[in-house]
Amino acid sequence: MSQVTDMRSNSQGLSLTDSVYERLLSERIIFLGSEVNDEIANRLCAQILLLAAEDASKDISLYINSPGGSISAGMAIYDTMVLAPCDIATYAMGMAASMGEFLLAAGTKGKRYALPHARILMHQPLGGVTGSAADIAIQAEQFAVIKKEMFRLNAEFTGQPIERIEADSDRDRWFTAAEALEYGFVDHIITRAHVNGEAQ
């Protein structure tokens, strides 16, 4: 047994919930089940790196039930997904909103799934600006750059023209699992033990 597995398997003192997540981690399953923030991002990035180090040839499954959250934290997760040599299969369950939608669509093409009653929300990246007039101008400029990059990436993930991504993101837009499949956020709707490649 490898050192990293030994370290991960030491579950003494963990709560029942923690023990469940540790058991899932041993099966290469990780969860984003809350708002995306720096703490959550650090945990998910560490788990992805750990699993990739253990076996670069096996998929990692990322289940997402999230209202979204921090852009910088979400982009840290995304960059780690890209960095990992193994495929990252993503699953929408419950709600994949905002940054949750972005990470869902960022999964390995052909391995992006939605459960039948999942809801997906796409909208413009949100960011507040504070400080002096000069600081506000700098923050606004940086936010515009980030927003443009996220539009570009979402267009790449979905196969939609960037102009459509920009237009559809202008206001909150919700998608059912079937609509998300048609739009290109996911590749399959999964029900029980089988996968449906077409909207149902």
Swiss-Prot record:
InterPro entries: ClpP, ClpP/crotonase-like_dom_sf, ClpP/TepA, ClpP_His_AS. GO terms for biological process: protein quality control for misfolded or incompletely synthesized proteins. CDD domains: S14_ClpP_2. It is found in: Cytoplasm. NCBIfam families: PRK00277.1, PRK12553.1. Fourteen ClpP subunits assemble into 2 heptameric rings which stack back to back to give a disk-like structure with a central cavity, resembling the structure of eukaryotic proteasomes. Forms a complex with ClpP2 and ClpX. Cleaves peptides in various proteins in a process that requires ATP hydrolysis. Has a chymotrypsin-like activity. Plays a major role in the degradation of misfolded proteins. Degrades anti-sigma-D factor (rsdA) when present in a complex with ClpP2 and ClpX. Does not seem to act on anti-sigma-L factor (rslA). This is ATP-dependent Clp protease proteolytic subunit 1.
